[in-house]
A protein has these predicted regions:
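Non-cysteine beta-strand/loop elements that form the S-adenosyl-L-methionine
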Residues: 77-79, 88, 194, 401-404
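Metal-dependent amide/peptide-bond hydrolase catalytic core
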Residues: 215-479
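Divalent metal-coordination and catalytic microenvironments
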Residues: 26, 47, 67, 78, ...
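A short small-residue
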Residues: 2-3, 21-25, 96-104, 193-201, ...
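General structural feature for long, well-ordered alpha-helical segments within catalytic domains
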Residues: 4, 15-18, 22, 35-46, ...
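Conserved short loop/turn motifs at secondary-structure junctions
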Residues: 31-32, 141-145, 294-299
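Histidine/acidic-residue-rich, glycine-tolerant segments that coordinate divalent metal ions
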Residues: 63, 85-87, 95-106, 112-113, ...
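Acidic/His- and Gly-rich active-site-bordering loop/insert found
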Residues: 2-107, 112, 116-137
Length: 479
């Protein structure tokens, strides 16, 4: 490692308290998707103090922003997130479910850590550019609404990510590895039906039930399920049943639908069929309805070149190591959920040899923390969830690291994740993420041939191009 790079990475240790303090402050005041005003202010203030040029209200989204430094190419984007989840309030460092505020929000996906680790990486790359005098630009992107709102997809609609030569990000996890493969695209639409209220016994013939329309829509979609391909999914939630009085014909009712498919073009087609069912349900029930587009995401394009680089950078940085006290806390959390039965890691799902190595490294899934880097696995494996990182990957080569921030086997979106969010386990993940992403970004700046290889792979995978799931007139909506 050359001295300039070493000094740049040392920036992360020198400012460690800054990065962990931002994460802790965001953990303390968890804000839901597209409402992350305090978090956005913390980041933009920090970026300005670190010497970045800040742009707020990015792509017209109030809590989206960027901080850039440098000039010319390559332009390396580093993605950060910071939204929380509802109903996951939990006390820090406590190995049992104890809320801070009953029913309150909590960082059950570790996004307080995600943004802080990415900021640390951007700060180190900035120092490298300044000290080396090399051409290049690093941009930290504050991306709100990953849990709902799909801000990165709205940004993709505006073509934002085409301006990057590559994008890097990470996500807190229970493993240390590099993400690969692809996943589902998705689209969410809210249907609000409006009828006519009436006394259900004395005047039912003059009523037009919005709740009937919702139920008829649900029945129609149930029949649709037989006539869609096996790789599609349809989910729904009745968000407003109209009230609690059965003797009233319900004048208003709403249902939120999400469709998924392995290709975004198929999600768009399936969504149109669901739209037609909503129209038919309103016609049958004698109601009107309003269709409100919420969000959507594309499937992810993997980039094996960047994945290999990120894995090598991870190996160079080294994974977090833990004290006896940290392992004791991790063990106490592990006792709150069933023991693991599956070898950890994405590669273990698709490669039997990696599964064997994973079992050995984890001592047959008995280690409380996965304190090892899993072997590199780059493949076309399918993961059923959805993420707006996918939309970024359609506009520029993209790769994502997963870094252990909570105990082995802890499920995401759980109180156990929240309990770890301000502990030293989490803080170590922040610093590791910063160094790993920064090391990879510096390699892309230093090696134009490597970046060109990643871009050639991206061009080959992107084929006919990006199909944006976000409708032209849609605006981000917090629901």
């Amino acid at each position: 490692m050359n001295e300039i790079k070493k000094a740049a990475l040392h920036t992360i240790d020198a400012h460690a308290n800054t990065f962990t303090a931002i994460s802790d402050a965001i953990w303390d005041e968890p804000e839901l998707s597209l409402k992350e005003f305090k978090a956005a202010a913390l980041y933009t203030d920090a970026l300005e103090k670190l010497g970045f040029t800040v742009q707020k209200n990015l792509c017209g989204i109030e809590t989206a922003f960027s901080g850039s430094y440098g000039s010319g190419h390559p332009v390396i984007g580093i993605l950060g997130e910071f939204d929380a989840l509802s109903g996951l309030s939990q006390q820090s460092g406590v190995a049992e479910a104890q809320s801070v505020t009953p029913g309150g929000n909590g960082h059950g996906c570790g996004h307080n850590l995600l943004g802080a680790g990415s900021l640390a990486a951007a700060a180190a790359v900035k120092e490298y550019l300044a000290a080396s005098g090399k051409p290049g630009t690093v941009v930290f992107f504050g991306c709100p609404g990953e849990e709902g709102g799909a801000a990165k997809a709205y940004m993709a609609r505006e073509g934002l990510w085409y301006g990057l030569d590559a994008a890097l990000t990470w996500h807190p996890s229970d493993t240390n590895e590099v993400s690969t493969g692809t996943n589902n695209s998705c689209i969410q639409v809210l249907y609000k039906f409006h009828g006519v209220a009436a006394h259900a016994a004395g005047d039912p013939h003059n009523g037009r039930s919005a709740l009937d329309a919702v139920e008829l829509m649900n029945i129609g979609v149930q029949f649709l399920r037989e006539h869609m391909t096996d790789d599609c999914r349809i989910h729904y939630a009745i968000t407003d049943a109209g009230g609690v009085s059965p003797n009233v014909v319900q004048a208003n009712a709403s249902v939120l639908y999400m469709v998924r498919a392995t290709k975004v073009a198929d999600s768009v087609k399936l969504q149109k069929r669901v739209d037609a069912i909503a129209e038919g349900a309103a016609l049958m029930a004698g109601t009107s309805y309003k269709r409100i587009f919420i969000d959507g995401t594309a499937e992810t394009l993997p980039n094996f070149t960047l994945e290999a680089l990120l894995h090598a950078s991870f190996a160079e940085t080294g994974v977090p190591q833990y004290t006896a006290e940290e392992l004791a806390f991790a063990s106490s959390l592990c006792r709150t959920f069933p023991p693991q039965t599956r070898a950890p890691g994405i590669g273990a799902k698709f490669d039997s040899e990696i599964a064997k190595e994973s079992r050995a490294f984890s001592e047959n899934m008995t280690k409380p923390m996965n304190d090892f880097l899993l072997p590199l696995y780059s493949g076309e494996g399918f993961l059923p969830g959805s993420t707006d990182v996918g939309d970024v990957s359609w506009q520029t080569p993209t790769a994502q690291a997963l870094i252990a921030a909570w105990p082995a086997g802890v499920p995401g979106h759980s109180w156990q994740v929240v309990a770890c969010g301000k502990t030293s386990l989490a803080h170590k993940a922040i610093l590791c993420a910063g160094k790993t992403l920064a090391t990879a970004a510096i390699a892309l700046i230093d090696d134009p041939a490597l970046l060109q290889k990643a871009r050639e792979e991206y061009a080959g995978r992107a084929g006919s191009g990006y199909v944006c799931p976000i409708e032209p007139d849609a605006v981000p909506i917090a629901i």
